[in-house]
Amino acid sequence: MKEFLFLFHSTVGVIQTRKALQAAGMTFRVSDIPRDLRGGCGLCIWLTCPPGEEIQWVIPGLTESIYCQQDGVWRCIAHYGVSPR
């Protein structure tokens, strides 16, 4: 298991992802974005899951990026743009 940090373009992404994770019984927490990272709406979701499974929780247009810590350094493992309206 590994912990991943999800950033979102807006709070709507946080809310929708939280609802999906709760419904699936996943282990996660919502918190402020760590100070050494910047992005999105100011809130993030920490998700604990096996590596590779984090991608299934990406919501197109709402998820901004996914990070994990490697040797104490934040690594962006995926970045997503905003969907056009």
UniProtKB/Swiss-Prot annotation:
Domain of life the protein comes from: Bacteria
One family name in Pfam for this protein: Se_S_carrier
Name of the protein in question: Uncharacterized protein YtiA
